[in-house]
From Swiss-Prot:
GO terms for cellular component: catalytic step 2 spliceosome; nuclear speck. It comes from Musca domestica. This is Male determiner protein Mdmd(Y). Residues 1-15, 79-92, 183-200, 235-259, 910-924, 1089-1118 have a biased composition (Basic and acidic residues). The keyword Metal-binding does not apply. The lineage of its organism: Eukaryota, Metazoa, Ecdysozoa, Arthropoda, Hexapoda. Residues 641-757 form the MI domain. Its main location: nucleus. One of its GO terms (molecular function) is RNA binding. The gene is Mdmd.
Length: 1174
């Protein structure tokens, strides 16, 4: 039909269309009920009429117009659900042409039918919109498209040729409709092809009113056979259809899985991301066997089949072992994808097998085996298998956490990946209200916090998230989480944990939760009161990583979003071999090059035998060079270069941890380790003062590689022998350096066996070294802990040189040395041993040597005292001669001159007898007193007495005191008149005392000898009586009222000869040592005799004067105050006289602190908490 005819018929059709549209609008507006009823009654008629019209249009269609329409552009026309579609221009032309032809034949029928179609469509739309919700529009649209597809397929069974061409076309249209939902072209782009003329608008209206008929007309074409299309065009169309089908399936999947669970969504995302890689490998399209050099190489069909068998779920388990080996032997190229996929499957099996074998005892061994395999490549599989194993067996969570802690210390990225996946798993389970997954994941996170893999902030965030919305499940999860990591959190941040417990208390008081959960909260508070003793943070057997070596990850709940599930799947590696070699070198550094599988320690290094063999190999190489005649450079350039690099790294690093990592990357040989340790020590010694940087650095290095411990031990032993070669500054720095190593247990304490502290081997440089060494240790540890460490049984044999017990001379030297440097508290055992040593049987060598040393100086003292007495006698005689007349002086000189030799012999014999008796008595007394307690006086006398004096000194001192008193009396007799003789006689008779030598002015030689013999006999028989006399004299001296007399007596004793002055000083020392015990005994005797109530008569004797007292509280109080005052006065007076040297004062203060006696001096030790008298 011509175009002119069509144009001439356009205005004729206009009123009909307008009328139809107006009629339809009026009908719909006036009454919708009538249209609905009309549609129900005439539904079958409308459908039959539409079919007839479409069949007539298709029959009249010519082949030429179809051919032209296929080549033209697409034209846009509206769809019945409102959205626009893109169809070929062929259909639009055909529809217009049919419309013009039909208008000639049946114009009225067409208008009525279009009106009916419009009404039916509107009613359908309104009912459809009311019935469906917004969420289900997509599914309704799909069901509609399926129904139309089925209705269309029923009309295509007439002609085969038309059916093929139109079915393809129909499928493309339907796919375009699907893609237009979320992926089609924008409306703004499609509007460009629409003409803005009135004719086009009119045509668009008519087309929209008859869209239903037009869609049916596509499928009912004439039965004439169309010519077949070219095969090239058909192939391109098929490819286009496949592409559209894949795209539509993807978008349908995305739309459908919005309501599906999270796991399936993750799998879909992963499939989309890795579709190309996995699809190419499975189909064999990709370059599976390709390397970097040969990209076009391909796997053979046989290799692909074997690869499918090996990478299947069974993993080749259905095959026999021989066949499996044959298949694996065929694939040998490591750079091929087939080999890499097989290796990955084997790695996955190893990882699963090792993780299933983990327990408390085998954690270290299994982690060591895991580190041998490339867990960096299989980190995704490792994390997945650990999480899966922990979920199936939560009782072993602490074991898995310990294994993760070891791996995290070596590879922190693996620990971070596992922690991220756990956090994401917890967040998803918390959002889905999955209680079991929340419990398992939170349990694992708690143990990772205990192992210092995760930071405590993550634990606090989880607790706050659970307690903010307090339901039964949330509170139960929070309680289990707090039980596991509560001890660690209280150590780190006790305030925040206290706030969480306060929130739990408020929740408990509200009473909204279940009774079971309330009981769980009460149990948690009881566990907190007990200090989490049943829920320890880390078991001792699982504390395998030290705090300094652990890497803690600070992750927040909001930051963690991506779990990196791609790492679970296979990925082709172009540089497979180089990466594997790198990991092997890394594992050797971690595990040691010659480490055995049974070893449980990490970074232990090579064995000593291998080190020796390496050194021997180096020596043999050097000898071979000498024999071969090569030139060898003895300047050692390699050693100089090593020193330079170490020195530069030490000075360039800011922190000791950074420096340790750099130094360990140098990969030193075993022969270079001694030089390395020596360089570190030299750098430390050259500093002006000691720097802790070097101590911390060596401690870190020794913990990272234990092969450095032995070189440091050898260096310490060498320095102890060569201290005389170093100056004081270097000695102090080195001593503090090794003190830090011993305190941190970087090297063992067995090194101290090389130190020997004796008088023969004592050198000033060695003493300085030991002094600074021990003082630094006491500063680090404290005196109490240091003393406790030295008393352990392990160090008993190593400290024999520092604290000798074989010889009393060495014992005294060690005691004096440590007391002089302010560490006298260490020598308590030696002091006790020195006191108890004489008790041992004479058969033992040590007791014999000790007793001989103690007895030898007693003879010397006795001889020296006898000589002193002779001198005193000579002086006394001179004093008496002054008072006598000149005649008697000559007579006495003659008598003394004749009998001088005889008198000397007698006195020597008596003195020796007396010394023997007194020494025996003292020995028996010491045995009786030592069974009860160690007395302070004997201990102090033995320690402070020099080696030339003995315990018999006390008896000699008592005699010398009496002599000094006799001298003082002679000095006073010069002033007194002759009538005082009678008074002295009366006093002697009343007091019943022994007769003095100097009572008479004129004494013959016989009287002097008789008085001396009587005194010596009485003293030898009754040694106890002499001690009582001494105590009575001291009491009288303290309790006497007149202090002036005592001062005069003391001054008179001072201007005696130098020999007498030495004896006086010795007496003062003895008195000072005995003072605490003497004062106690004196006060007890003073109170027994009546105390302040005791009065004296005219002759100076005490009398008990009883006073009638009232038993009132105030009288008692006054009496007690009086006693205190009296006691304080006596102590203050006596203590002010005593004067001691610095060493003796320090020791006396120490003994006072030990035995709880008050002293007048300010105490220097910081451990003393007693009050002292000033």
């Amino acid at each position: 039909m011509n175009a002119t005819d069509a144009e001439s018929r356009k205005p004729e059709n206009k009123p009909s269309s307008e009328s139809s549209s107006s009629g339809s609008t009026s009908g719909s507006s006036d009454g919708e009920v009538s249209s609905k009823t009309y549609f129900k009654n005439n539904k079958s008629k409308v459908l039959s009429g539409q079919r007839e019209v479409v069949l007539e249009v298709v029959r009249d269609l010519s082949y030429t117009i179809c051919k032209e329409a296929e080549e033209k552009l697409v034209e846009r026309f509206p769809r019945k659900d409102g959205s626009n579609e893109m169809l070929p221009k062929e259909d639009s032309i055909n529809t217009n042409h049919n419309y013009t032809t039909d208008s000639d034949e049946h114009p009225v029928e067409l208008t009525t039918k279009t009106e009916e179609c419009k009404n039916t469509e509107k009613t359908k739309k309104k009912s459809f919109v009311r019935a469906l919700s917004k969420d289900k529009q997509l599914s309704a649209y799909r069901s509609r498209s399926r129904s139309t597809r089925l209705s269309y397929s029923g009309h295509i069974s007439r002609t085969h040729s038309v059916e093929k061409s139109l079915s393809r076309y129909k499928k493309s249209v339907l796919r375009n409709r699907r893609t237009s939902f979320g992926h089609g072209r924008d409306s703004s782009t499609t509007k460009r092809s629409v003409s803005r003329d009135k004719d086009n608008r009119l045509r668009r209206r008519i087309g929209s009113s008859r869209s239903h008929t037009r869609s049916h007309s596509r499928f009912r074409r004439s039965e004439k056979k169309l010519p077949s299309r070219s095969p090239r065009r058909i192939r391109s169309q098929e490819r286009r259809h496949e592409r559209r089908r894949s795209m539509s399936s993807d978008y349908e999947r995305i739309a459908l899985r919005r309501s599906e669970p999270i796991k399936r969504r993750d799998k879909d995302e992963f499939f989309k991301n890795n579709k190309k890689v996995s699809g190419d490998i499975k189909k064999g399209k990709g370059n599976d066997n390709g390397t970097v050099a040969e990209l076009e190489a391909k796997i053979t069909e046989r290799q692909r089949k074997s690869l499918d068998i090996l990478t299947s779920r069974t993993g080749g388990a259905c095959l026999t072992p021989d066949k499996l080996r044959m298949i694996q032997a065929e694939i040998t190229d490591k750079s091929s994808a087939a080999y890499q996929s097989i290796a990955r499957e084997a790695l996955k099996k190893y990882i699963h097998g090792y993780i299933n074998k983990v327990n408390v005892d085998s954690v270290a061994v299994i982690t060591r085996k895991l580190l041998k395999d490339n867990i960096v490549r299989g980190r995704g599989v490792l994390c997945h298998s650990i999480i899966q194993a922990q979920a199936t067996s939560p009782k072993f969570t602490h074991v898995y956490a310990a294994m993760v802690a070891i791996i995290n210390s070596k590879f922190p990225n693996i620990g971070e990946l596992l922690l991220k996946r756990l956090v994401i798993q917890f967040k998803r389970a918390f959002g889905c209200n999955d209680k079991t997954v929340c419990l398992t994941s939170s349990h694992f996170i708690a143990h990772l916090v205990n192992q210092r893999v995760a930071h405590e902030i993550l634990a606090l965030e989880i607790l706050t998230l659970l307690i903010e919305s307090p339901t039964d499940d949330n509170v139960e999860v929070a309680i289990t989480f707090l039980k596991e990591c509560g001890m660690k959190l209280t150590e780190v941040s006790s305030d925040r944990v206290g706030g969480i417990f306060e929130l739990l208390k408020n929740i408990l008081h509200q009473g909204k939760l279940d009774k079971r959960v309330q009981y769980m909260i009460k149990v948690l508070f009881q566990v907190r009161r007990d200090g989490f003793k049943d829920h320890q943070s880390i078991i001792e057997s699982l504390e395998l990583v030290e705090e300094y070596a652990q890497f803690t990850h600070l992750l927040l709940l909001e930051d963690v979003t991506y779990p990196k599930d791609i790492l679970n799947e296979f990925k082709f590696d172009d540089q497979y071999e180089t990466n594997e070699e790198k990991y092997k070198a890394l594992s050797k550094n971690i595990l040691g090059s010659h480490a055995s599988d049974s070893d449980g320690s990490f970074g232990s290094g090579s064995n000593s035998e291998t080190a020796l063999s390496d050194c021997d190999k180096g020596k043999n190489e050097v000898n071979d060079k000498y024999t071969s005649g090569d030139i060898i450079d003895e300047t050692k350039p390699n050693l100089i270069a090593l020193r330079r690099t170490i020195y530069l790294t030490l000075n360039s690093c800011l922190d000791y941890e950074e420096c340790a990592q750099k130094l360990m990357k140098m990969q030193l040989k075993t022969c270079q380790q001694n030089e390395f340790c020596q360089i570190l020590l030299d750098c430390c010694a050259e500093q002006r003062t000691y720097e802790k940087f070097y101590g911390l650095l060596t401690h870190r290095i020794c913990k990272m590689n234990k092969s450095f411990i032995e070189p440091f031990k050898e260096i310490f032993k060498d320095i102890c022998q060569t201290t005389h070669c170093l100056d004081t500054n270097r000695l102090r720095n080195i001593s503090k350096f090794f003190a830090h190593l011993l305190f941190t247990d970087a090297i063992s304490w067995d090194v101290l066996d090389c130190i020997k502290l004796t008088e023969d081997e004592a050198i000033t440089s060695r003493c300085i070294f030991i002094k600074s060494f021990f003082q630094e240790l006491v500063e680090y540890m404290g005196l109490y802990h240091f003393n406790k460490k030295l008393k352990t049984e392990v160090l008993a044999g190593t400290l024999a040189g520092l604290f000798p017990k074989d010889n009393p001379r060495n014992i005294r030297f060690s005691i004096n040395f440590f007391t002089s440097i302010g560490l006298g508290g260490i020598t308590n055992e030696l002091c006790q041993l020195l006191k108890i040593a004489p008790k041992s049987a004479p058969s033992s060598s040590s007791s014999s040597s000790l007793s001989s040393e103690l007895s030898a100086p007693s003879d010397d003292d006795s001889s020296s005292d006898s000589e002193n007495k002779k001198k005193h006698k000579g002086k006394n005689k001179k004093m008496t001669k002054k008072k006598n007349p000149s005649k008697k002086k000559e007579e006495t000189k003659k008598i003394v001159g004749k009998n001088k030799i005889a008198a000397k012999n007698k006195t020597i014999k008596r003195r020796t007898d007396k010394d023997n008796s007194s020494s025996k008595d003292n020995f028996l007394k010491s045995e009786s007193s030592s069974n009860e307690s160690i007395s302070l006086d004997s201990l102090s006398s033995e320690l402070f007495a020099p080696s030339s004096y003995s315990s018999s000194e006390s008896s000699n001192d008592s005699e010398s005191k009496e002599k000094h008193k006799g001298k003082n009396k002679k000095m006073t007799k010069k002033k007194n008149p002759s009538n005082k003789r009678e008074k002295t006689k009366k006093k002697l008779s009343k007091n019943k005392k022994a007769p003095n030598k100097n009572t008479k002015k004129r004494m013959t030689e016989k009287d002097i000898s008789s008085s001396e013999s009587s005194i010596s006999e009485s003293k030898s028989l009754n040694c106890s009586a002499s001690n009582q006399n001494e105590n009575e004299k001291r009491k009288k001296r303290v309790t006497s009222k007149s202090r002036t007399k005592r001062v005069k007596m003391f001054k008179q004793c001072q201007w005696v000869d130098a020999d007498n002055q030495r004896d006086i000083k010795r007496k003062k020392r003895a008195e000072y040592r005995y003072e605490p015990l003497v004062y106690r005994k004196r006060n007890e005797e003073y109170l027994k005799k009546g105390g302040p109530n005791c009065r004296k008569d005219n002759y100076g004797n005490r009398q008990n004067h009883e006073i009638s007292q009232r038993h009132d509280s105030e009288i008692k109080r006054r009496r007690e105050e009086r006693k205190k005052r009296h006691h304080e006065k006596n102590h203050s007076r006596e203590y002010k006289r005593s004067k001691l040297g610095p060493c003796q004062r320090e020791y006396f203060l120490y003994m006072c602190c030990q035995f709880y006696y008050p002293c007048t001096f300010q105490c220097l030790c910081q451990n003393c908490h007693f009050t002292f008298y000033s």
